[in-house]
Amino acid sequence: MHLNSNPNSYICDAYQHADLLWSLSPHVLTKAVQPQVTLLPTVNGSNPRYDGVDGHWPESPERSPCVAGIIPVIYYSVLLSLGLPVALARLAARTRKPSYHYLLALTASDIVTQVIIVFVGFLLQGAVLARQVPQAVVRTANILEFAANHASVWIAVLFTVDRYNALCRPLRHRATSSPGRTHRAIAAVIGVTLLTGIPFYWWLDVWRDADPPSTMDKLLKWAHCLIVYFIPCNVFLVTNSAIILRLRKRGQRGLRPLVSKSTAILLGVTSLFALLWAPRIIVMLYHLYVAPVHRDWRVHLALDIANMLAMLNTEVNFGLYCFISKTFRATVRQVICDVHMACALKSQPKQTVVELMLKSVGTEL
């Protein structure tokens, strides 16, 4: 487990827990203040020989370079600054439809993913602080990150099953569907995903671990691939195929297919999920059995890009919602107008602000 002293790859060796925290270059951030020495990396593994280690690590010429440079810093900063406000805007919408609660729960899990992984883990600890953190904090963050990812995926699975029942078993769906039942199902999924995140306390960092993967490493990585991709994709494939088949049968009978907005959103969300997460799963298994990330710069770059695509999944859902649903577009428009109004009020004198507020109240009345 070695570290490169090249300043352009320093942040590559910063804290990247759950291997969803990707490489970046701090050349423009820390060159003036950081001496060009080989720093002790944050320990993120279950190997006891790293506990209590202090000092500098020897350089390793085999360390794969960080070829992505400063691009991930800009990418994830834009991703967070754009994705978090619009995700909060989605939560401002109100409805009594059970299917809509699944969308709101999916939004909430996306917010948690963005805050923990992108801001706390990647930008704050890696790009801003550029320092080590206690091992217990790193491992606890692993639990939260994996739990947030698993919750986001499995809430989408719940949403898929709900749409399947609504189209293929409409009478049963109307009799059993209710906001209370939906809330209990979402709460159960969140509780189970928190439990599934606990074993990832011992997740090893693929960016720095030079030792061959142990049995625990293989079990955790395969468990992650099964929980977050293979099992959900099989559910999506079966249910979406049944939904599309039912819609085609309605069209052949001369009836209108009646593709609701929720169903259209569902098909888009699941398709994008399968496409955007596939590269990450492929590269992870390639790293596990063929070439490690820490030695081959091509695998290093491939995992960078794959992780960026996987994180993009939390953002493209919003564009899909707005493209299909008038409710989302109206909500976002209203939130933007409210923010603009608040900024305008702050820039006006006190008397003018009172007049504007009175006019607004008079208009509503």
UniProtKB/Swiss-Prot annotation:
**Localization:** Cell membrane
Glycosylation sites (chain numbering): 44
The organism's place on the tree of life at top rank: Eukaryota
Positions on the Cytoplasmic side per record topology:
88-102, 162-185, 246-264, 326-365
Any matching Pfam family? 7tm_1
Q: A Gene Ontology molecular-function term?
A: G protein-coupled receptor activity
Q: Where are the transmembrane segments?
A: 67-87, 103-123, 141-161, 186-206, 225-245, 265-285, 305-325
Q: How does it sit in the membrane?
A: Multi-pass membrane protein
Which keywords, in A-to-Z order, does the entry hold?
Cell membrane, G-protein coupled receptor, Glycoprotein, Membrane, Receptor, Transducer, Transmembrane, Transmembrane helix
> What GO terms in the biological process aspect are recorded for it?
G protein-coupled receptor signaling pathway
GO annotation, cellular component aspect: membrane; plasma membrane
* Residue ranges annotated as Extracellular topological domain: 1-66, 124-140, 207-224, 286-304
The record's listing under PROSITE patterns reads: G_PROTEIN_RECEP_F1_1 (PS00237), G_PROTEIN_RECEP_F1_2 (PS50262)
Q: Which family does it belong to?
A: Belongs to the G-protein coupled receptor 1 family.
Q: What does this protein do?
A: Orphan receptor.
Per its record, how is this protein called by name? Probable G-protein coupled receptor 142
Q: Which organism is it from?
A: Mus musculus
